[in-house]
Amino acid sequence: MAKGMMIIDGQRVSFDGEKNVLSVIRKAGIEMPTFCYYSDLSVYGACRMCVVENEETGKIDASCSMEPRNGMRIRTNSARLLKHRRVILELLLASHNCNCTTCEKSGHCHLQTLAQQFGVRRIRFEDTRERYEIDNTSPAVLRDPNKCILCGDCVRVCEEMQGMGILNFAYRGSSAQVMPAFDRKMAQTKCVSCGQCAAVCPTGAITVKNQIGEAWRAIHDPKKRVVIQIAPAVRVAVGEAFGIPAGENVLDKLVTALKLMGVDEVYDTTFGADFTTIAESEEFLERLKNGGPFPMFTSCCPAWVKYLENENPKYLKNISTCKSPMEMVGAIFRDKYAEKDAQDGRTTYHIAIMPCTAKKMEAARPEFIHAGRPDVDLVLTTHEVIDMMQEMGIQLNELELESPDLPFGLGSGAAVIYGTTGGVAEAVVRHCLPDKSKNALREISILGLRGDAPIKETTVTIGDTELKLAVVNGLANARKLLKRIDEGEAFYHLIEVMTCQGGCVGGAGQPYGLKTTKEKRGDGLHQSDNAAMFKRAERNPIVVRMMAEYGEERCHELLHVSYEK
């Protein structure tokens, strides 16, 4: 990796392994504007906002695609460069739907932010672009081509991180668009609803489908009892919108906020995750006893399940039959509230607050609809709940603490870490290992299941059997691992797959954050695990009691599902 010294705006700045000049500039504390640059994606260099001026040659080049060289002298904010950036912004705005006040991304739109930053107050160019139909067919995202600035971020994240290639460029010149192949609607593609395209989109061209109106209607309906479950990853991210550091657990404040908003009962999805851990562990041990099929894949991530259905259905027999924690809670609520609804004449309306856009798709799956109603009536993302709190004028950081309601508000530390990569696999290992000591917990924590590496591999011994485990981030990496398995190059007993970087903490429904922000959220969940009253699912007294009351047959009916192509 290159090392050296360069001059940026007259200041000496060292570099040591940075992959481009842009990284060195940002290291120097200069916030260089970009639309199309993400450090985890390939360099595209299309937006030209990050251009710098070479003091020696006078040339203007994109800093994202320049390698740093020893002795290089550049300027980042000359009069020439500022004019260049303003013209780019004017051209983008000229062909952009500028209904900013009603845009879903207003306040978070990067184009809006940079236009304000660079003082673009008028647009001198005429808009000659056509107007295109909005695509609202996806259960998770909405695509508005009229707000697209052709940065290519969605194209690259879909191809490079997920290996799906759902979106790409079509046509040329002023007719250029980003769209699915053959101008299909999103619902006509093999999109898995991960929503990462919306997470990286700098404008309102792709946004998470907003269902806030449905939530308010339910809350204000006196004939409805609104019950909410909160996923683990939400508690360490929702506070970011209120000045609370990423990773700080604000679950008890969020419970207070939801009660102020008019929600009747608030529960914790970790309760369902403990059910999942026990059921999935029992299934895994049964497979070990019967010799497979292996690998057993985790089933918590609905985008991963959808990917297997679309791309590799032969592996559906390998996926765990356990429902996700969200859907386990949904099934239990459906069972527990049926009699109560009949007695008091109200209808229980079940909302799940999730970090994940694919959960919107999962809730609508026919496997989870009974008697014409879904087990989870509505899924709201962390973003949507933030918007609802802000609409109410609630300042989360100033609220008192209130614990989730019982009996469905109690979860283990193992359940909390479901929200970060490696958490599901670690929870299963904790349950399956016969050694339940604190020392065993410490050893499990350093097995290699944690961290953001694309593919993590480790071994653990249970009884006389050495088990091979893998944890995967991103569907593109999952595809690579499946290829190795197909070709006989790899064998595993258990594989956890999470579609989003870092696991659920990096879900597309979370506040927009850098990679370091996602890491802090994951660290926050591990800290909550460390502080938990009990660390293993089988130590949850309510879950253990309920499973005993239900019995094996009823548990299987409520907690398991099969996926068929």
Task: Label the predicted regions.
Residues 5-8, 97, 130, 139-141, ...:
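A short, structure-level motif marking secondary-structure boundaries and short turns
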Residues 48-193, 199, 206-218, 224-225:
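Fe-S ferredoxin-like electron-transfer domains
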Residues 10-12, 101, 134, 187, ...:
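A generic secondary-structure micro-motif detector
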Residues 5, 12, 16-73, 77-83, ...:
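Iron-sulfur-associated redox domains of electron-transfer enzymes in respiratory
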